[in-house]
């Protein structure tokens, strides 16, 4: 009998991973461009802080997009309501922190966008694992600022996968 344990840094083969070099000031413009050109059913956008999730969700709503924030400051019932709206198609974009999105399983999620690069490689794997589930194809996009170049390399080494540049 042979028992193998999957590494915590394994990513699904169903997920196409891409990155985009972007300076901090131009992230919102880059996001707007992606939302214009990518065909998506539902998307999770990961931001590093609770405040950033709220701010980004408000900016997307101001552009007429069905977006909402989800973070650790929200009551559990409110988080569940927001996730329910995503499942039902009333929302198309969820802007989340890592903690708020742990274990999130919504079939509609076709895209995961890392607006802020995660602090560690394991978080990256957890984030992009919200798409490409149950045999479906998924898209993972990572924004990388010039000083985050090293983290991009660390993610590629940990996942043993080259992430293609957009």
Which residue stretches match the model-derived regions?
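Conserved helicase RecA-like core
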Residues: 1-166
